């Protein structure tokens, strides 16, 4: 074995075992989301990451749900889908199936212009991840899961949500269209949120619907 293999697996150890498992990738059209407002929120927020992540495009701050209610609404739809197809079952001492609570960890907006892409990545250590299409056409770049046994490529459609286990590798090829491909993404974690007292800004008396002010521009 090479020195690199020794470093990854441990000196004298064999490579990790290979598993073939099935995981749900849920694709649904949802109604009732305010796509025009979501686009405005993303454009007003602007680029906060500067291409420093796998997504080589405009990418907003991570906590858009704390300042924009419409991001929270999309997350609630993602939760509904995730609850409907748990990755495993948990029982109490009497054998009764328990519902594992999910909470929204983070969510952000993305705008892909022509030629922009997202490199292969995953969202571990979250449990579920999702992406929602605010605007795209059938010729826009798909969401690709390169490690699926059979090629899995999901063409975006406006008002489409895709929910999948966070550890699945995925990517977005270079965007071929002249118009923008506008998305939002988020992560759901299991368990109760640690900071339960932190209310979203839009759920406070101070909120007026404005995207101006120190909280909006906070890093």
Across the structure, where does each feature detected by a protein language model lie?
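A hydrophobic alpha-helix/topogenic segment detector
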Residues: 1, 175-178, 219
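Catalytic core of non-heme Fe(II) oxygenases with the double-stranded beta-helix
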Residues: 100-174, 179-183, 187-202
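Non-heme Fe(II)/2-oxoglutarate
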Residues: 1-99, 201, 207-212, 216-217
